[in-house]
Every structure is written in structure tokens, then in C-alpha cells.
Amino acid sequence: MKSTFKLSLAALLVSSAMAANAGIAIVDNEEGNFSVGGNVELNFNYQDRESNENGDAEFNQDGRVLIEFAGEKYTTSGHYVGVKAQPLFESTGNVALDDAYFEFGKKDSWAIKAGRFEAYDMFPVGLDVFLEYSGDTSNELYTGDSAYVYQMKEARGRGSDGQLMYNQSFGNLYLEIGTMIGDRSDLFSDTYHGTAVDHDNAKDSFLVRPVVAYNMGDFTVAASVETNLISDAIVDVNGKDISDRTGYGLTGNWNHGSWNVNANFAYLDAVDETNASVGLNALYNNFGLGYVYGANEYDSTWAQGDVKVNTGYASYEFQNVLEVEDFSILLGTYYTTVENKTNNVSAFSEDDDFGARVRLYYEF
């Protein structure tokens, strides 16, 4: 009976939030707050990918509904505790989770956060309604036979195991130290440079990711490094430590009037390969345009030479459609190519991919 009541109450709160334009504040006073909100995102996709085995164009629809429960409690000394949970209800029928964390600290000063969340974005891509690559992005699996567009995300967060972060602001200076602990063997697929990954003997990793950011009016710059401190956390079947990976990142943002511009650089020093990525994107009013370049250099018996990935993308947002506040229709497209200059011609497919998307988005 108690469970039924809780579910009914949650359904009532969600219904109330959707009836409002921008969520509902259940409690909001000097002692704390509790709110329910979320958003709906549905995509209608077209893709023409040379990597598709039968060569046919693809049409599909995907999306999800995110419900956010967030609350904070304050003290007279300026300290607080907070909690946030964001369950995802996917159009496939699966139920997933975005953020789920607990934090405490002092307002406008320091905070400690534990759970599941994302740390500072060191490779922002702007308005990316539809953005994919001929290869992998670094918050997905590292696939041995694909190019790797590294983006300083291997220790950013939202992993399946533990995560802890400390951050503090000193005026215009922001400091952050993020960590991820636990099994990170899911970063790799079955092989690394043609050799099978020994998933059965993986150890728990300990990844650290410090960030320093400084704001100068319209400009913000940030630098970061991420690395795994545990030796032999992930090895191949020959015993080679493939978890020995250190990444470096630098990003800058200019935000003035209707303009928002990001410039990004990321570099990964991994076992028998290096990965460098450069990104530039701009948002003017509701129009976004971006470009990402990735260069992989291999030096092993499996492959020697370079693989390069070029990706361009564009987006546009129609806001407040039908005069409904926070209801948007977004258009997005991307085009990506890969060029294999290694001595292993069969290792990397030179595929060109194109995609277009219409997105329906409503924030409640």
C-alpha cells in the first residue's frame, strides 16, 4: 500500500510539472527547496553510412523522457546538502539514469559531490542536434578497428561505478578535482591493436581529473588532465597494460550578446598510439555550426602511421513553437570522413557518413 501511494504521489507531481511551463517548485523557501521538472526529446533520423554493411540508407526514431527530482536544504551559516535524480524513460522501452548524486558544501564556495554525474565539459560542441563520427567518441567504447575522436571524457563521469568530486570557487577562479573508481574495462571492446582484451582479469581503476578554469568577463578558459593511477587495471591477453592512458585538454569560450563560441583541444597519450582532437563551434542566435578534427598516430606491429577524421555539423532551433513556451523543433545534420594513412589498410575503413535529424523538444 505504501509503495502504491509513493508511485501515485510521484505521478501526481510529474503531471503537475508537465501542466506548468517550467517545472513545479514543491518547496522553495529560506530553509531549502524541492522541485520536479524534466524534458522530452524525440528524434526522427536519416543516415547514409558507408559503414552500413548492406549500404542502405537508414530511417529511425529514438528519444526519451527525463524526469528530474532535485532538492536542497540550507543552514543559516550558508552550508547546504543537496540531492538530484534524473531517471530516463527511453522510447525503446528501456529505463536508464542520467544523474543521481548527493552533494554538500557551502553556497558560492566549495562542494563535495558523490554518485553519478558529469564533471566539467572540456570539449563542448555547442548546439549538436546530430553529431556522429567515423570512429568512436571517448565516452563510448574504444574499438580497435576504428578511429578515436578523443574528447577528454574518459574520466568525466556517469560511469557504472563510484564517482567523487570536490570543487571550489575563488572569485573568477574555479578548481575541480574529479575521480572515478571501479571497473573501467567497458571502455574497451574485444580487442586492442588486434590483440584480445583480457576482461576476465580486469582490476578496479582509479581515475583522477583535475580542472582549472578562469573567467574574464566574456571569456572563460579551462585546462585539465585525466589519468588512471592503477597499474595493470586492464591488460590484453599478452599481459600488456593498456589502461596506461593520460589525457590533456584545453578549452576556451567567448560569450557575448547573441554569440557563443567554443575552441577545444584534447590530446591522449595511450599505449602504442596518440590521439589529438581539435574542435571549433559557434552559436549565433538559434543557428549553430561546428567542426571537429581528429588525428590518431599508431606505432605498433599492428599498425604504423596516421588516421584522420574530419567532421562538420550544423543545427538550427525554432523556439516557442505554436507560441508554447519551451517547446522547440530543432534541425541538425552532420558529415564525417576518415582517411587511413597507416600501413594496415584493412584496419580502418575509409567510410563517409551523413546524417540529418528533426528533433522535438519540450522542457517542463
What are these model-derived regions, one by one?
Residues 318, 352-364:
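Outer-membrane beta-barrel "beta-signal"
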Residues 203-205, 209-317:
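Detector for outer-membrane/organellar transmembrane beta-barrel domains
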Residues 38-46, 83-87, 116, 177-181, ...:
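Transmembrane beta-barrel strands of outer-membrane/channel proteins
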Residues 89-95, 122-126, 154-162, 183, ...:
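Solvent-exposed loop/turn segments connecting transmembrane beta-strands
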Residues 32, 55-65, 95-100, 158-162, ...:
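Residues that define the transmembrane beta-barrel architecture of outer-membrane proteins
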Residues 24-45, 56-184, 213-217:
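Outer membrane beta-barrel
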Residues 78-81, 108-112, 172-177, 218-223, ...:
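Repeated loop/turn-to-beta-strand initiation elements of outer-membrane beta-barrel proteins
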Residues 1-24:
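Gram-negative bacterial Sec-dependent N-terminal signal peptides
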